[in-house]
Amino acid sequence: MKPLNIIFAGTPDFAARHLQALLNSHHNVIGVYTQPDRPAGRGKKLTASPVKELAVANNIPVYQPGSLRKEPAQQELAALNADIMVVVAYGLILPKVVLDTPRLGCINVHGSILPRWRGAAPIQRALWAGDKETGVTVMQMDVGLDTGDMLLKTTLPIEDSDTSASLYEKLAEQGPVALLQALEGLANGTLAAEKQDEALANYAEKLSKEEARLDWNKSAQQLWQEVRAFNPWPVSYFEHQGNTIKVWQTQVSETTSTAAPGTIISASKKGIEVATADGVLTLLNMQLPGKKPLNVADILNARGEWFSPNTRLANEAQ
């Protein structure tokens, strides 16, 4: 297969993994687009994206326009004369004139099995909803949000032990493999594009810190899914004794209870069992303010009086 001249557009670590795969391939990455440097850390020092750092380390020209809607930026991109543009978690909207510029157009690697979970947080929403599988879709980009024709799909079972962090790692490995397969198919003309079924489409909205508050009026099953979805960010939590307590790991208990939602049923080194609207949730790993995450046994040693049976955990901030 003849090497393709590729423009790569991406910003976070997930995107950098895909850029590295292209750099390891026989294709030519002729330019990299990434978001402008942002203030980060306590000193708010301007910090380059992981994609920029990788591009600079490999002596690839880097472009960081604040927008691709203006003609000078579009002309600069067109001057690269790329065969194709690969977009992975870039963060800027690509207008139609940009999508039409490369000979083979623009393709995107998305962390879900489209058309399910279009949008910003597909990995987290798959866990949040209790999906049994997820995967990667490589699509031909159009002007919509993740609405383009699908070129290649891979699937991955979601395990009970998975969190957003672990799924992210799995998809960050699966995505680059799918990307290289799709590029080969595009170059050879062997890929058959598949339209997305709009009837099956839904949107993966960004997570919020407010959404991470545990609502004991939900089912134990749903709360278990949410704790996994919100790990490592924004991390599920509840308010108790005037403190915000983060919850990193739970499981659905086989215990049954008629107690009011939010009531502690039992507390032992095996876990703190809390009644919900449907079922009992066992808290296994938590984080007290200013402390590291700890197993419940250690939490009870430090603050056992907070978690006595029949204590009611608040649904709202106290």
Curated annotation (Swiss-Prot):
Catalytic activity: L-methionyl-tRNA(fMet) + (6R)-10-formyltetrahydrofolate = N-formyl-L-methionyl-tRNA(fMet) + (6S)-5,6,7,8-tetrahydrofolate + H(+)
Keyword Transferase belongs to the record: yes
Lineage top rank: taxon: Bacteria
Record GO cellular component, one term: cytosol
Gene3D superfamilies in the record: Formyl transferase, C-terminal domain, Formyl transferase, N-terminal domain
Record's keyword annotation contains Transferase: yes
Any one GO MF annotation of this record: methionyl-tRNA formyltransferase activity
Disulfide bonds listed in the record: none
EC numbers on record: 2.1.2.9
Residue numbers binding (6S)-5,6,7,8-tetrahydrofolate: 112-115
InterPro entries in the cross-refs: Fmt, Formyl_trans_C, Formyl_trans_C_sf, Formyl_transf_N, Formyl_transf_N_sf, Formyl_transferase-like_C_sf, GART_AS, Met-tRNA-FMT_C
Alphabetical list of Pfam families matching this protein: Formyl_trans_C (PF02911), Formyl_trans_N (PF00551)
Keywords on record: Protein biosynthesis, Transferase
Family, per entry: Belongs to the Fmt family.
PANTHER family in alphabetical order: METHIONYL-TRNA FORMYLTRANSFERASE (PTHR11138), METHIONYL-TRNA FORMYLTRANSFERASE, MITOCHONDRIAL (PTHR11138:SF5)
Protein purpose: Attaches a formyl group to the free amino group of methionyl-tRNA(fMet). The formyl group appears to play a dual role in the initiator identity of N-formylmethionyl-tRNA by promoting its recognition by IF2 and preventing the misappropriation of this tRNA by the elongation apparatus.
NCBIfam families: fmt (TIGR00460)
Protein name: Methionyl-tRNA formyltransferase
Species for this entry: Shewanella baltica (strain OS155 / ATCC BAA-1091)
Organism phylogeny: Bacteria, Pseudomonadati, Pseudomonadota, Gammaproteobacteria, Alteromonadales
Gene: fmt
